[in-house]
């Protein structure tokens, strides 16, 4: 039986399970940043894009499930996150999407399914909007596409545990280990002002999309998720009960089942 981590106490103490060993990892230089990536398994590619302040290690429960199911799992540390660097420019999802394309080019991946969590979901959908031939589909979990989609911030113990783990990981992985607060402030500025897609912008998205919303998401309004599903052509809405913004860590089996059902359709 799966052991739940609904309050993230295990994640705060230990992190997610470690990513598997791989011989295929490295860096790609792109537009003022050095972007770290790693790949696992073989088969059709699925790119996992983590959330704000996190790193690829947050996908420790998802990578093995994808590999077992016959997919090639690719993780990327977003610019300025984890092992990746950044320049002095403000963060933007457009820049992050260009970083993903640079990794795809390095790995000779013409087209992939994109699984995005929070900021990673925004990055994935913007990539799909800008370069639809590169995206087989987008699994869009727990993010907004305009500023009206976010709830008023309310600190909770679960959020505190997540930030505590992110702070520890940043100190261990980053080239600027003592700059977490400045990093957090820069990411927060991006999150407050971006993205800002109109309903017409959403209507232009032409790839398969699943809008995935958890029952207790601390940051994203459920009505916004449903609005996205209505306005993106042929998008599906997936509801995850009993979990929050941190579903991939809280109940991995439930989250993995939703990912696998989606990628099996878009990569068939």
Predicted regions and their residues:
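Active-site loop/oxyanion-hole signature of alpha/beta-hydrolase fold enzymes
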Residues: 68, 75-115
């Amino acid at each position: 039986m799966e052991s739940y981590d609904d309050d993230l106490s295990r994640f705060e103490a230990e992190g997610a399970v470690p990513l598997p060993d791989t011989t295929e990892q490295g860096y790609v230089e792109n537009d003022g940043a050095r972007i770290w990536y790693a790949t696992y398994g073989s088969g059709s590619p699925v790119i996992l894009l983590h959330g704000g302040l996190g790193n690829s290690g947050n996908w420790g429960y998802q990578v093995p499930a994808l590999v077992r199911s016959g997919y090639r799992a690719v993780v990327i540390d977003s610019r300025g996150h984890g092992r990746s660097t950044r320049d002095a420019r403000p963060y933007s999802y457009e820049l992050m999407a260009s970083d993903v394309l640079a990794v795809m080019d390095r790995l000779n991946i013409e087209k992939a399914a994109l699984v995005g969590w929070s900021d990673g979901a925004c990055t994935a959908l913007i990539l799909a909007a800008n370069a639809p031939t590169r995206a087989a589909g987008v699994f869009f979990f727990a993010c907004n596409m305009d500023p009206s989609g976010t709830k008023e911030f309310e600190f909770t113990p679960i959020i505190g545990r997540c930030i505590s783990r992110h702070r520890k990981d940043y100190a261990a992985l980053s080239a600027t280990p003592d700059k977490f607060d400045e990093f957090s402030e820069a990411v927060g500025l991006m999150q407050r002002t971006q993205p800002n897609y109109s309903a017409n912008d959403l209507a232009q998205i032409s790839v398969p999309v699943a809008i995935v919303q958890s029952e207790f998401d601390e940051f994203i309004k459920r009505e916004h998720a449903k609005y996205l599903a209505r306005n993106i052509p042929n998008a599906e809405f997936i509801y995850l009960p009993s979990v929050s913004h941190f579903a991939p860590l809280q109940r991995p089996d439930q989250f993995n089942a939703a990912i696998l059902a989606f990628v099996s359709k878009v990569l068939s």
